[in-house]
Amino acid sequence: SCLVGSEMCIRDRFNISSKTFVSVAAGVKISELENLLPSSKIFRAMPNVGAKDNLGITAIYSNHDSKEMVEKFKFIGESYEVENEDQIDLHTVLIGSGPAFFYDLMQEFEKRLDELLTDKESKRLVSIVFLSSIINAIKNGENLEELVESVASKGGTTEAALQKLDEKGFKKIFSEAVDAGIKRAKELSMN
């Protein structure tokens, strides 16, 4: 007999002591899971929202060989193994939260386009601008700096706008935002 709901009872009742487990819980370290499931193979996987369209990007970490698990996660998009568990935090902020950064920026584009077009037209055109930019980056395989330069003519409107972003510290603000996300991820793993 065991205490219903206790960790030991769950392990015994469902015979899960030597199974493979994949955790997608943010902030839950492998060591915590190993305490619950000492004889199991445990993997941490952090997919992003693109997984629902088979365009996900998943970081995988384990104390075991992760090559097979990396292959299994390719059914929802790209996947890769991180060398240490702390790298999951950076992945979570840049890849997991990344879509929210794009959506937020897209909203700002829409607000300005709303000065010219209807809300529906603005949403559609902004989505096309982002989509075509992404396709161009993937298709051409150029570095992003070269792609920026291909759009920004010397003395032109794009160059003026980019200079204003630099002047206002856009890159520094972005870096600080990423650092804030990583800090929060570390706080979550301590709770």
What residues fall within each predicted segment?
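Short, conserved loop/helix-junction motifs that constitute active-site signature segments
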Residues: R13-S18, N35-P38
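Single conserved hydrophobic/aromatic residue that forms the stacking wall/gate
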Residues: S1-G5, C9-I10
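Active-site capping/gating segments
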Residues: R44-A59
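ADP-ribose/adenylate-binding Rossmann-like module
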Residues: N15-K29
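NAD(P)-dependent Rossmann-like dehydrogenase/reductase catalytic/cofactor-binding core
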Residues: S127-N191
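Short hydrophobic/aromatic-enriched beta-strand-loop microsegments
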Residues: T20-S23, K41-M46
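Internal alpha-helical scaffold of NAD(P)-dependent oxidoreductase catalytic cores
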Residues: E32-K41, I57-L90, A100-E142, A180, ...
